[in-house]
Each structure stands twice: as C-alpha cells, then as structure tokens.
Amino acid sequence: LPAHQTDITAFRARDESLKIIWLGHSSFLLNMAGRIVLVDPVFSQAASPISLFVRRFQDPPISLQMLPTIDFILISHDHYDHLDMKTIEFFVERETRFIVPLGVKNHLTGWEIAAERITEMDWWETAIFSEITFIATPAQHFSGRDGIHPNETLWASWIVQSAQHSIFFSGDSGYDEHFQTIGDQYGPFDVVFLDSGQYNERWREVHMFPREAMQAAHDLRARHHLPIHWGMFEPVSYTHLT
C-alpha cells in the first residue's frame, strides 16, 4: 500500500489541533494537547508467536527509532496483533506510561516494564494524566496468547479526551449495543477508529463487517471515521461482500 511521507516535526508540535498518524492495522499515533499517545503498537515482522505466520507485508511508515517521545502507550487487549513483546521491550528504559485493561499488566512486568509505569483499568473506569483523560469502555471480543489460558485478561475499547478533543478506539469488537451506550454517554467524537478489516461470518461476534462499523460510527455520533484492523499483515479468510 502507498505510504505518506510523515513530517514528525509538524506532528510533534504542541497546539490545539488533533494530529493522527495511522501506522497500519490497529496501530496509530495520536497528538492530543501536545501529549503523544501510541495505540496498540506492533512493529515486529509477524503478529504471531511463530514468525512464519501472520507476517507483515510492508514496513510501517515510521520505524520505532523514528518515533517521537511517547507519553502514553494504550493497549486494547493481549492478542499478538495488538500487544507485541518486542515493541514493548523497546520502551523498557523510557518513561512512557502504559494504560491497559485488567490483567495485561502481568505481561508487561514480565517483559521488564516497571509496575509503577502501568495503569490497569476496568470497563467504565477513568484515569487522568497531564491534561489527557482515558476512559476504558466495553468491547465484544476475547483475549489470550497461547490458546490454553483464554480470557484471563480483559479486552477494552477506549475513549481519549482533552479539553478540546475526544476520540474513540474500538479495539477488536463485534457490533452490539455498547456502541450506542458509549455514544449516548460520551459522544460526539471527533474521530472514531473502528475494527473493520477481519470480516468473516465465523467471527461476526468478535469483529465487525464494514457495514456494521458504519452503523457503530453512527451510534457513536462520529464526526470522522477511520476504519482499522487492515492493511499491514497477511490476510486470513474473508467473507466476500456483495
């Protein structure tokens, strides 16, 4: 896929504008009120415990080394295409704070991230840091990294707010009434990032078809909608749309 040349200096500028860089799949950078948030970062060559599978078909538009100073890393759940050990280890010696769902802290501390740098949250909990508000909200999905210990950690969608802006990130989720509930309580949103690229009838409960993502954007009262969960890793089986 074509990649736009990114001006990191302009992206880092602290002003009242909302700046976004999509890194492919569900990873993106967010500059809100001058604070830099990195969401579900995966920079490895494969989103799998075995590097032969779910391989990246192109490099991200920015390398780890090119990233600006990251204030926060936000994680939706612990699947390999959203929580990447090698990427997390890059931040061991940095001061980045991690915002994660319940149970995910254990993964990070196992990878030598200091516990005091990690904030774990349950659905509907709120945390405020440096002018930025993080709200953990529901998602319809599941978790687990080995197929033996499913659903021992929580999965979540997220709201990120400043005084001027508000965004919503679905994480991985099937379509259900939680989008309407979130939209009624916290909408409208300047931008919503919605799972739209893993559509298959077998996975309807845990991923959205594009038309369902459009309905979710409507439920959330989105001003802008960015479809995510596509465009970076080898695709699996899809249901053809007619």
Stretches found by the model and what they are:
Residues 94-96, 221-224:
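A short helix->loop->beta-strand "cap" motif at the edges of active sites that frequently abuts
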Residues 30, 40, 77, 134, ...:
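Divalent metal-coordination and catalytic microenvironments
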Residues 79-83, 105-107, 125-128, 142-144, ...:
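Active-site environment of divalent metal-dependent phosphoester hydrolases
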Residues 108-122:
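Helix-loop-beta element that forms the nucleotide-linked donor phosphate-binding surface
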Residues 239-242:
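Conserved small/polar residues in nucleotide/adenosyl-binding loops
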Residues 2-17, 23, 27-78, 85-90, ...:
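Pre-active-site segment of Zn-dependent metallo-hydrolases
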Residues 15-18, 32-37, 126-135, 161-167:
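Beta-strand-turn-beta hairpins that frame and shape the catalytic cleft
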Residues 86, 141-220:
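Active-site-proximal loop/helix segments of hydrolase catalytic cores
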